[in-house]
Amino acid sequence: MRRAEIERETKETYVKIALNLDGEGSFLGDFPIPYYKHLISTLCFYAGWDVEINAKGDIEVDPHHLIEDTGITLGKAFNSAILKSSFLRFSNKVIPMDEALVMVVVDISGRPYLEIKDDKEILKGRLIKEFLRGFVNNSQMTLHIWILSGENLHHVEEAIFKALGLALGEASKEVSNLKSTKGKIW
C-alpha cells in the first residue's frame, strides 16, 4: 500500500496528514481556512488520493504559516508514499475553468523545482505560491505551471489545483518499471 502519515508541529502550526495514493479521492478532516480546504480537497479529488488532515495554526496572525506548513506536510507524505513503488513519473494537463486556462507539467524526479509562468501577475502576492513551494520542495518533484489565460483569481487557482491533481494522479500511477536513464530517481 502506498500510504504515509506525517505530522509537523511548530510554535505556529500543527499539521497531521494521512495520505493514500491509491484511494478514491476523499478528503476528511479539519482545515480552518475554507478556501484552501476547497483547493486542497480539489487536488486530492482529481488525483484520486484519500487524505485525512488535521490542521490548526495562528491564522489570526496570518494564514501564511498554516498554508505553507500544510504544503510542506503534504509534500513529505507524498514523497514517503510514492517511494513505495515504481511510478509513471511524468504527466501534463491543460484545464479550463470558464475564462481561465492553465497548463501543469510534473516530473516526480527527486529534484525539487517550481516554475510559475504568470505573465499577467495574477498570482502576485498569493499564498498559493507558498503552498506549492512547500509541496514541491518536500515531495521532491519538478512542477511547471503556465497560466495561459484568466481574469477571475478563483478560477485560475482552482484550475491549477484541478490540473495538478489530474497530472499527479497520472504521474504517480504504479508501473512495473520506473523510467530513468540513471536507473533510479533518488
UniProtKB/Swiss-Prot annotation:
InterPro entries: IGPD_sf, ImidazoleglycerolP_deHydtase, ImidazoleglycerP_deHydtase_CS, Ribosomal_Su5_D2-typ_SF
SUPFAM superfamilies: Ribosomal protein S5 domain 2-like (SSF54211)
Signal sequence region: none
Alphabetical GO biological process terms: L-histidine biosynthetic process
Enzyme Commission number(s): 4.2.1.19
Record keywords: Amino-acid biosynthesis, Cytoplasm, Histidine biosynthesis, Lyase
Biological or metabolic pathway of the protein: Amino-acid biosynthesis; L-histidine biosynthesis; L-histidine from 5-phospho-alpha-D-ribose 1-diphosphate: step 6/9
Catalytic function, reaction form: D-erythro-1-(imidazol-4-yl)glycerol 3-phosphate = 3-(imidazol-4-yl)-2-oxopropyl phosphate + H2O
Compartment(s) of residence: Cytoplasm
GO-annotated cellular components: cytoplasm
Disulfide-bonded cysteines: none
Domain of life according to the entry: Bacteria
KW Protein biosynthesis (keyword) present: no
Record-level Gene Ontology MF annotations: imidazoleglycerol-phosphate dehydratase activity
Family: Belongs to the imidazoleglycerol-phosphate dehydratase family.
Alphabetical list of HAMAP family matching this protein: HisB (MF_00076)
PANTHER family linked to this entry: IMIDAZOLEGLYCEROL-PHOSPHATE DEHYDRATASE, IMIDAZOLEGLYCEROL-PHOSPHATE DEHYDRATASE HIS7
Name listed for the protein in its UniProt record: Imidazoleglycerol-phosphate dehydratase
Source species taxonomy: Bacteria, Pseudomonadati, Dictyoglomota, Dictyoglomia, Dictyoglomales
